[in-house]
């Protein structure tokens, strides 16, 4: 097993100001365990008293070697791993992956499947943004905002469950189309969501 190397200021000298190197300002690590970063990044902050004068982001904490692991998988098994790249955007990750496969073999996708993909990826984007906004509110102690956002997100996850059998990690979008056609209740479920969501935003 590889040993972890000690991180020294020498690795960051070229990124921070002279004031930080002389001790006039303070360098502070925020994350990757800080409650407001949700474990996916580290921020090296340069502080002058209580004022942040510089911020160096380190976003490498989300990388889990998935790309390397996918090299040893069949294309069907590899797609399941795209759900885990960003669990808030599984449909978008599936789509990005299968679009490359389709381009590689010059595969045409039926118009209905293309439309379903767009609808589901856009719903996924809304659900992802609701988590973002809700957790921002939670970080500011706005519990109600968090609960409102998650209430709307639940309705979207219900639609995903209706379509794919899963609320998250759906692996629904497949090369050449989608896993299966949507059930008859799909249109009503989406229309019901679209009817209430604009009012709830206001």
Segments predicted by a language model, with ranges:
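Active-site bordering "gate/hinge" segments
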Residues: 1-42, 46-202
């Amino acid at each position: 097993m590889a040993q972890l190397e000690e991180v020294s200021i020498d690795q960051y000298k070229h990124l921070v100001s002279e004031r930080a190197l002389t001790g006039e300002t303070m360098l502070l690590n925020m994350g990757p365990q800080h409650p407001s970063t949700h474990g996916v990044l580290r921020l090296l902050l340069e502080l002058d008293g209580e004022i942040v004068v510089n911020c160096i982001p380190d976003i490498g904490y989300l990388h889990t070697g998935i790309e390397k692991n996918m090299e040893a998988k069949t294309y069907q098994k590899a797609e399941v791993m795209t759900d885990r790249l960003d669990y808030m955007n599984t449909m978008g990750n599936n789509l990005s992956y299968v679009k490359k496969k389709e381009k590689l073999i010059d595969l045409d996708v039926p118009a209905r499947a293309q439309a379903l993909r767009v609808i589901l990826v856009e719903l996924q984007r809304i659900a992802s943004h609701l988590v973002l906004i809700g957790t921002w509110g939670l970080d500011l102690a706005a519990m109600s905002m968090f609960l409102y956002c998650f209430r709307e997100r639940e309705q979207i996850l219900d639609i995903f469950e209706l379509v794919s059998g899963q609320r998250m990690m759906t692996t629904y979008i497949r090369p050449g189309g989608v896993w299966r056609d949507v059930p008859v209740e799909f249109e009503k479920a989406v229309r019901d969501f679209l009817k209430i969501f604009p009012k709830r935003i206001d």
